[in-house]
């Protein structure tokens, strides 16, 4: 949620920011109209309350003088003002609800460093690491290689749950677990994160804090009987951990990491990446979250990105870093870098991590603040990123490390976790 004062004081700036993000600028005019009504009614109700207080004093004076008729007239006038106040209070409540609903649909403001563009075609490549492997044979896609080894089963997954689910056996199941432990060990032992074990089911309010609701409710798995949601990412509970709290500046930044399954309906992605494990309804991910100060948040974003990159470097997987343009930014992000790993089956790079600075957008929605050294209370900035998506990393290893005979070499960094050098 952005600051309503920004909309009041710089409406043209906000409209331009919304246009950069392909959003309708009309919502700014709608908010300004509601805000003007709210402030006008607030002035009216304050004046009426002042009148009522004045009448109360006059009634007291009349009582002391025994002026019965005056008391009755003043009392009736006071009741009339009270009814006016009640009516205006009802109007204020309704306007406040409308404003809150509309404010929750306004995206974050892109940072000045974000390139302007309509869609992903305007994204910028920042850097590459590693060279895609050149095979002297036709490499297999993971959706062929996995089943041929008897370690990946899409048919039985469909029998259990429908499309876009996977069953893995034996060493592939162990590889998924090894990757999770490898990532968590790196982030906690080398990068200073605190590991957190989290609920995978959260309240509507929790989903609203990070911006999943109300805009993306159709993408979420909802438990209707209890109005609870399966998390689409560990970012949701990690950020909300500190909602309605005031932190101390000396304790910032807070660095959290968590492994969780993630659940997404993918309602808007029909026909995309329908084969294999690239786009699943359930997938594993190690998440990284920072709660930091405004002064250092963009520098911290660069650090967070480097932590995600280090996972891919240790696994010796070719990747590139992309900066998203304004039209491709996520709803709550002010600035985002995507990490894309090379996949031979696509002969291209595919997203494996998205790292964002949400500035104070989530903090305002969740009322996450901190006390500065001078005693002033301000909103924190929140950062999030995948460190990284486990299933897509598994796919990248299977495809990039495959041999001509179908067996798969194990990256050196994972050999201590798996206890072997070759799979299959």
From Swiss-Prot:
This enzyme's EC code(s): 6.1.1.11
PROSITE patterns linked to this entry: AA_TRNA_LIGASE_II
GO biological process per UniProt: selenocysteine biosynthetic process; seryl-tRNA aminoacylation
Tagged with keyword Cell membrane: no
Record's keyword terms, sorted: Aminoacyl-tRNA synthetase, ATP-binding, Cytoplasm, Ligase, Nucleotide-binding, Protein biosynthesis
Compartment(s): Cytoplasm
Positions bound to ATP: 264-266, 351-354
CDD domains: SerRS_core
Subunit annotation: Homodimer. The tRNA molecule binds across the dimer.
Domain comment (free text): Consists of two distinct domains, a catalytic core and a N-terminal extension that is involved in tRNA binding.
Protein's name in the database: Serine--tRNA ligase
Gene name of the encoded protein: serS
């Amino acid at each position: 949620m952005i600051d309503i004062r920004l909309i009041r004081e710089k409406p043209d700036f906000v409209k331009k920011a919304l246009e950069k993000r392909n959003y309708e600028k009309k919502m700014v005019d709608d908010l300004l109209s509601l805000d003007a009504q709210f402030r006008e009614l607030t002035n009216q109700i304050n004046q009426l309350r002042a009148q009522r207080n004045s009448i109360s004093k006059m009634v007291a004076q009349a009582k002391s003088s025994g002026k019965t008729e005056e008391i009755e007239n003043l009392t009736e006038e006071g009741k009339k003002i009270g009814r006016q106040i009640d009516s205006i209070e009802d109007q204020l409540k309704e306007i406040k609800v409308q404003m809150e609903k509309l404010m929750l649909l306004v995206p974050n403001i892109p940072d000045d460093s974000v390139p302007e563009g309509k869609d992903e075609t305007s994204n910028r490549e920042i850097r590459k690491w590693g060279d895609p492997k050149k095979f002297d044979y036709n490499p297999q896609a993971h959706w062929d290689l996995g089943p041929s080894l008897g370690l990946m089963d899409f048919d039985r997954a469909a029998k259990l749950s429908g499309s876009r689910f996977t069953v893995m056996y034996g060493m592939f199941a162990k590889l998924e677990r090894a990757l999770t432990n490898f990532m968590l060990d790196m982030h906690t032992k080398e990068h200073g994160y605190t590991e957190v074990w989290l609920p995978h089911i959260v309240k509507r309010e929790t989903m609203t804090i990070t911006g999943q609701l109300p805009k993306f409710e159709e993408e979420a798995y909802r438990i209707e009987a209890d109005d609870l949601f399966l998390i689409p990412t560990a970012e949701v509970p990690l950020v909300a951990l500190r909602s309605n709290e005031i932190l101390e500046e000396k304790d910032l930044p807070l660095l959290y990491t968590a492994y969780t399954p993630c659940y997404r309906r993918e309602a808007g992605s029909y026909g995309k990446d329908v084969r294999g494990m690239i786009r699943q309804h359930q997938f594993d991910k190690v998440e990284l979250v920072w709660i930091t100060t405004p002064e250092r948040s963009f520098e911290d974003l660069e650090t967070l990105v480097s932590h995600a990159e280090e996972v891919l470097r240790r696994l010796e997987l070719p990747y590139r870093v992309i900066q998203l343009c304004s039209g491709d930014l996520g709803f709550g992000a002010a600035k985002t870098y995507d990490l894309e790993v090379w996949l031979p089956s696509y002969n291209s790079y595919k997203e494996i991590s998205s790292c964002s600075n949400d500035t104070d957008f989530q903090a305002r929605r969740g009322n996450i603040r901190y006390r500065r050294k001078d005693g002033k209370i301000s909103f924190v900035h929140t950062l999030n990123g995948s460190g990284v998506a486990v299933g897509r990393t598994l796919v990248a290893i299977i495809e990039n490390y495959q041999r001509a005979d179908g067996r798969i070499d194990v990256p050196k960094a994972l050999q201590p976790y798996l206890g072997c050098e070759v799979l299959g």
